[in-house]
A protein has these predicted regions:
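A short, small-residue-rich loop immediately preceding and capping a beta-strand
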Residues: 28-51, 55-66
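A glycine/threonine-rich phosphate-anchoring loop and its flanking beta-alpha core
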Residues: 50-144
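Glycine-rich beta-strand-to-loop/alpha-helix junction loops that act as flexible
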Residues: 7-9, 39-41, 169, 181-182
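Active-site segments that bind and position negatively charged phosphate/pyrophosphate groups
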Residues: 141-250
Length: 303
């Protein structure tokens, strides 16, 4: 057994990080009959699992995620890699198939509450893609999750895995994009805030993306306004407050549209029409502009 200590940026691994992993696999004579084990956050587990999948046709990989968001996601999705700092689009990804994922919930109970909030935001978005009954179960157990109760945490992880697997295995191609809900808004805000975005926690950017896109969904696909407010309430229950900032609507709208085409040629967003029904939906310019103006005005008032 050989140990490799890999320092990966929480923002995401690069191909340079992958090259280090490949070098270690080669130096240690790892073959497809061996086992690669990754211990770390989402970015670390993602790059190691990606490398193991390429090595010798495919080498089995086991993951031991150490953060709550990683426990919820690494079995089904990986954090995309970037080619280099000069090509910073995080677009190198595949569906991970680790042979084993082991979650130590003591790490969740002992963690700083601030370090759990990205996991909470991911959990809210994931549960929106599940059924109405599962969403209701989830919202009722938020206090127990926050208290670190074992049964509630086990249920949260299990519900997340089931919901994410169902999305990836959906027969409707449109439904397979459900896990991207909120991410267009997240990327838009990150770009528009510029250097200031580095001071904003990742969970807050993702949460703002979900808040904004939930409002778009109300107009674009008749998403019940009560559920829009439930999303807001759930995020606030997890201690994720609204973010205060001042942006020009025209610049925000232009960047939002640009982000839609970064990963796809379709001008459509994964939006919830109902609980458990997040589908690709076309958003009219008038709807986007109206909601963007209202959203940005509300955030400016927080300053």
């Amino acid at each position: 057994m050989s140990l490799l200590v890999l320092e990966v940026s929480p923002a995401g691994a690069t191909l340079a990080d992958a090259d280090i992993v490949f070098g270690a696999l080669s130096a240690n004579g790892i073959t497809c009959d061996d086992l690669v084990v990754a211990v770390g956050d989402t970015a670390t587990c993602s790059v190691v699992c990606w490398c193991a999948n390429q090595w010798c046709g495919r080498t089995e990989c086991a993951l031991l995620p150490t953060t709550f968001d990683a426990m919820l996601t690494v079995a089904t999705t990986m954090k995309p890699l970037v080619a280099s700092s000069a090509h910073a689009l995080p677009a190198i990804a595949f569906r991970p198939e680790p042979g084993l994922v082991v979650c130590d919930l003591d790490l969740v109970r002992e963690a700083d509450p601030e370090d759990l909030k990205l996991g909470y935001a991911v959990l809210v978005g994931t549960m929106l893609s599940s059924s109405k009954s599962r969403w209701n179960q989830f919202t009722e157990t938020v206090p127990e999750i926050l208290a670190g109760e074992e049964v509630a945490l086990v249920n949260a992880v299990q519900w997340s895995q089931t919901a994410r697997k169902d999305v990836l295995m959906a027969t409707n191609p449109s439904a397979r994009h459900a896990l991207d809900f909120g991410k267009t808004g997240e990327r838009t805000l990150r770009v528009c805030l510029g250097d200031a975005a580095s001071q904003v926690p990742a969970y807050q950017l993702l949460s703002e993306g979900m808040r904004f896109e939930a409002r778009l969904a109300h107009d674009a696909c008749d998403f019940d306004i009560d559920y829009v407010f439930e999303v807001d309430d759930c995020l606030e229950d997890f201690g994720i407050e609204e973010l205060a900032f001042d942006l020009e609507p025209a610049a925000y709208i232009e960047e939002f549209r640009r982000q839609q085409f970064v990963r796809s040629n379709r001008s459509m967003l994964p939006l919830p029409a109902a609980l458990g029904a997040i589908r690709l939906t076309s958003v009219e310019d008038e709807v986007l502009e109206r909601h963007a103006h209202a959203y940005l005005a509300s955030r400016k008032e927080l300053l």
